[in-house]
């Protein structure tokens, strides 16, 4: 077996198996796995912060309802030139095509509503969800691998991703191997997960919002770099949308941490948890 630093990644295809008209796809299975594992992690973390695990389970339903449709809507809007001609594909989420920034926005809105209804701190919930979110992102990126999508520029590095001719951009139709950006981001996200869990357990009295803000900064730094390698970025004119949003995420995260620790003030919040 070749070591990882000399690895050629080749997708076996997007489908796990097919029975008649029923198709089980890797993308859907990975999303489901990310939700289940993330839920279990957040439930476990909640026991350290005097939050009922059942409240986290209830929150998870809200997050799924808010995040997944918004993730798809975000993607479709920035690919409207294509989807306006293929309206029947707008809802085919199992084929791929969701945007994590849309999921984050939808999830935050759902969590804000939930926190007001439950009368708990929004930022306390955000701190419990952030490690699960980045874990889910690390898992979900492998869906891009199986779909042969979200890859980088052509490369001849020892580690590379083979892309079938039908999935290659026209500009690179004669190139077979590309940067495995799915792997870069998955590994980066796992490192961010380690940072967040270390903060959670080493600094149990950290101010509310700290872990989520650190997530915003660290994830966005990685995405800012990795997005520059990709060939299929969502664009708005000459701008890569994900890089613009990542810069905003870094800025908001740094401002929030400055507010908490340099100005020594609390973040605006819903009703504080007891």
Swiss-Prot record:
Q: Which GO terms describe its molecular function?
A: phosphatidylglycerol-prolipoprotein diacylglyceryl transferase activity
**Any idea which UniProt keywords this protein has?**
Cell inner membrane, Cell membrane, Membrane, Transferase, Transmembrane, Transmembrane helix
Topological relation to the membrane, as annotated: Multi-pass membrane protein
Name where it's found.
Answer: Cell inner membrane
Q: What is its EC number?
A: 2.5.1.145
Q: Any signal peptide, and if so, which residues?
A: none
The UniProt entry, under InterPro entries, shows: Lgt
Q: Name one Pfam family in it.
A: LGT
An annotated GO cellular component: plasma membrane
Q: Does Transmembrane helix show up as a keyword for this record? A: yes
Q: Which sites bind a 1,2-diacyl-sn-glycero-3-phospho-(1'-sn-glycerol)?
A: 141
Its annotated pathway reads:
Protein modification; lipoprotein biosynthesis (diacylglyceryl transfer)
Report the main location listed first in the record: membrane
Q: List all membrane-crossing ranges.
A: 19-39, 59-79, 93-113, 120-140, 181-201, 209-229, 243-263
According to its UniProt record, this protein's enzyme class is: transferase
Q: What PANTHER family does the record point to?
A: PHOSPHATIDYLGLYCEROL--PROLIPOPROTEIN DIACYLGLYCERYL TRANSFERASE, PROLIPOPROTEIN DIACYLGLYCERYL TRANSFERASE
Family, similarity comment: Belongs to the Lgt family.
Q: Which NCBIfam families match?
A: lgt
Role according to the record: Catalyzes the transfer of the diacylglyceryl group from phosphatidylglycerol to the sulfhydryl group of the N-terminal cysteine of a prolipoprotein, the first step in the formation of mature lipoproteins.
Question: What is the protein's name according to its record?
Answer: Phosphatidylglycerol--prolipoprotein diacylglyceryl transferase
């Amino acid at each position: 077996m070749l070591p990882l630093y000399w690895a050629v990644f080749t997708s076996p295809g997007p489908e796990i198996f097919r029975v008649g008209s029923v198709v089980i796809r890797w993308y859907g299975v990975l999303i489901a796995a990310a939700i289940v594992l993330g839920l279990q992690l957040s439930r476990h973390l909640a026991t350290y912060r005097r939050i009922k695990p059942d409240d986290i389970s209830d929150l998870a339903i809200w997050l799924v309802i808010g995040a997944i449709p918004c993730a798809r809507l975000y993607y479709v809007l920035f690919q409207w030139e294509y989807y306006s001609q293929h309206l029947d594909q707008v809802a085919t989420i199992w084929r791929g095509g969701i945007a994590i920034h849309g999921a984050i926005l939808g999830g935050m809105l759902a969590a804000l509503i939930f926190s007001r209804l439950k009368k708990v701190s929004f930022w306390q919930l955000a701190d419990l969800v952030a490690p699960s979110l980045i874990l889910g992102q690390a898992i979900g990126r492998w869906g891009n691998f199986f779909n042969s999508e979200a890859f980088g520029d052509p490369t001849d590095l020892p580690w590379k991703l083979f892309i079938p001719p039908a999935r290659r951009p026209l500009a690179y139709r004669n190139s077979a191997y590309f940067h495995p950006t799915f792997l870069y981001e998955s590994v980066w996200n796992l490192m961010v997960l380690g940072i967040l869990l270390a903060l959670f357990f080493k600094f149990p009295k950290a101010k509310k919002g700290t872990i989520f803000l650190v997530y915003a900064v660290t994830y966005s730094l990685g995405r800012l770099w990795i997005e520059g390698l990709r060939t299929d970025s969502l664009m708005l004119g000459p701008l890569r949308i994900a890089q613009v949003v990542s810069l905003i995420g870094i800025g908001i995260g740094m401002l929030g941490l400055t507010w908490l620790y340099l100005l020594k003030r609390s973040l605006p919040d819903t009703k504080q948890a007891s």
